[in-house]
Amino acid sequence: MNIHEYQAKRLLHTYGAPIANGVAVYSVEQAEEWAKTLPGPLYVVKSQIHAGGRGKGKFKELPADAKGGVRLAKSVEEVVANAKEMLGNTLVTKQTGEAGKQVNRLYIEDGADIERELYLSILIDRSVGRPAFVVSTEGGMDIEAVAEETPEKIVTVAIDPAKGVTDEDANKLADALKLEGGAREDGLKLFPILYKAFTEKDMSLLEINPLIVMTNGRVRVLDAKVSFDNNALFRHPDIVELRDLTEEDPKEIEASKYDLAYVALDGNIGCMVNGAGLAMATMDIIKLYGAEPANFLDVGGGASKEKVTAAFKIITADPAVEGILVNIFGGIMKCDVIAEGVIAAVKEVGLKVPLVVRLEGTNVELGKKIINESGLNVISADDLDDAAQKIVAAVKGN
């Protein structure tokens, strides 16, 4: 689960992280009212959407030369003018896709005199099985580009969960970020704070880009991105309350109600598969034969007829779907259950696109019999290769 920048910064501030004074607003009137409470004379007006690259993004409704989703303002009047342009409009960034995301709220905060911009994140380093800090002196930019062009400028420090952030760890991080004087003191205090927040709140990612050193020599969290482990949310009702459903795909929201692993994609062939590995292999082979998957959907190992029916409805609700591939290997999951679920869903919502079903494993013959005797126009496939070729051909009209 993701949260907005202003929510992430407030959360980190409760642990003691230094942030600027700021407020989230939902209207131009609120922007004016609350900007007057900030000291100024420099303000930052930030679009609040669940996507990176906001500063370089573009609003669909504005001229091509208009400013992006993060803007500086030197007066309350400029704050208001920017709010009028940003609220309600659609911001397109490298992470939103062409559709973009509508900006429904802004975060207005004090400006800062920046001397240096740094990068810091905490994530789970699966190569060592530990949380790890990833830091760089090249902050305020795309860290992926830094990793590709100048990987030597990225330093990773794995943390022993039994010890937490030790003095040695903190000094390694401070050295990697070239912190000195007051900035070093701030950093040595900040690193354990961030690690505590990461572990206590079951975060999967904590990213600060940039972490700034100001001209007064102090450190401040200028931007923050936080993602939480969905499997641990039951322990954090306070975090669940921060969820913004308007930022999520409606199909993914519906899938979560049935405990389905669903991710919407940009293709035209809907996929229903059991098992994440098989689901990814299915998407790969669809691409191999010249089409694009419309989704990742893993119904899991113990799906019921009702769960399969719900999955099918979610796939068919996507107007971009021109064909559906059901690919099931019955281990824990039984092929007859899948067959019954698919038939129930087709009878309920109708079948307007080609449907290819490949079943293998437990009760496969019974599953095939159920489908064959259903009277539905379903294309049967013998293996994954055959299934992918048939659905691609059906969609292309071959």
Swiss-Prot record:
Residues 9-254 form the ATP-grasp domain. Its cofactor is Mg(2+). Its EC number is 6.2.1.5. The keyword Metal-binding applies. ATP binds at K46, G53, R54, G55, E109, A112, E117. Binds 1 Mg(2+) ion per subunit. GO terms for cellular component: cytosol; succinate-CoA ligase complex. The keyword Ion transport does not apply. Keywords: ATP-binding, Ligase, Magnesium, Metal-binding, Nucleotide-binding, Tricarboxylic acid cycle. It catalyses: succinate + ATP + CoA = succinyl-CoA + ADP + phosphate; GTP + succinate + CoA = succinyl-CoA + GDP + phosphate. It holds the Pfam family ATP-grasp_2. Substrate binds at N274, G331, I332, M333. Pathway: Carbohydrate metabolism; tricarboxylic acid cycle; succinate from succinyl-CoA (ligase route): step 1/1. Mg(2+) binds at N209, D223. GO terms for biological process: succinyl-CoA metabolic process; tricarboxylic acid cycle. It is an enzyme of class 6 (ligase). GO terms for molecular function: ATP binding; magnesium ion binding; succinate-CoA ligase (ADP-forming) activity; succinate-CoA ligase (GDP-forming) activity. Succinyl-CoA synthetase functions in the citric acid cycle (TCA), coupling the hydrolysis of succinyl-CoA to the synthesis of either ATP or GTP and thus represents the only step of substrate-level phosphorylation in the TCA. The beta subunit provides nucleotide specificity of the enzyme and binds the substrate succinate, while the binding sites for coenzyme A and phosphate are found in the alpha subunit. Heterotetramer of two alpha and two beta subunits. Belongs to the succinate/malate CoA ligase beta subunit family. This is Succinate--CoA ligase [ADP-forming] subunit beta. The gene is sucC.
